[in-house]
Amino acid sequence: MDKKELAKMIDHTLLKPEANYEQIVKLCKEALEYGFASVCINPCYVNAAYQLLKGSDVKVCTVVGFPLGAATSETKTFEAVQAVNRGASEIDMVINVGYLKSGNHDYVEEDIKTLVNKINGRALVKVIIETCLLNDEEKIIACKLAKKAGAHFVKTSTGFNMSGATSEDVALMYDAVSPNLKVKASGGIRTYEDAIKMINAGASRIGASSSIKIINKK
């Protein structure tokens, strides 16, 4: 896979709580230089990134209900709509993991569906299921709920929990949602080999803060 092809599959990510404006500017400049699919940033920087990337092919991606997923549906939906209004074209939302593990599947599905419907096609919705907190059965259920709710992607991890993406989880998720939804692998992907492993397992998108190292095969 050549550099350009791989770059188009990467969300160049900076979600650290201490991320400052200068770092966001640098992230956007790097995304333009390398041709990454998007920058994935915290909501407060969405409009700044939109202004920096306007007119390019690089999308603005942000996170909702992040990183716990425990906010109410109303709060998540408000966050998402506000982000889209400020220039985001991709939303990575976290499911309510506790409700999923409690067996409250209807709530989890409705949580996603409400957000998808409110956005009304103005942005891609990627649903973070936080694989490290789920058993395989729960992972499959979460993926199928995301599919029923009208999401566009399922995503492995926030990168803020015990562990991130594994190729086994990516393959499991791909089998659960393909061909309707795509899979984003995120969390702990730091090398070219890591990225290719995830892509070979079924990932169409990679979330990484080590994007440039990955592209340069460092």
UniProtKB/Swiss-Prot annotation:
GO terms for biological process, alphabetical: 2-deoxyribose 1-phosphate catabolic process; carbohydrate catabolic process; deoxyribonucleotide catabolic process
**What cellular component GO annotations does this protein have?**
cytoplasm
- State the compartments where it is located: Cytoplasm
Active site location: D92, K155, K184
Q: Sorted alphabetically, which keywords does the UniProt record give?
A: Cytoplasm, Lyase, Schiff base
Q: What is its EC number?
A: 4.1.2.4
**Reactions mediated catalytically:** 2-deoxy-D-ribose 5-phosphate = D-glyceraldehyde 3-phosphate + acetaldehyde
Functional pathway = Carbohydrate degradation; 2-deoxy-D-ribose 1-phosphate degradation; D-glyceraldehyde 3-phosphate and acetaldehyde from 2-deoxy-alpha-D-ribose 1-phosphate: step 2/2
Q: What's this chain's function? A: Catalyzes a reversible aldol reaction between acetaldehyde and D-glyceraldehyde 3-phosphate to generate 2-deoxy-D-ribose 5-phosphate.
This protein's name: Deoxyribose-phosphate aldolase
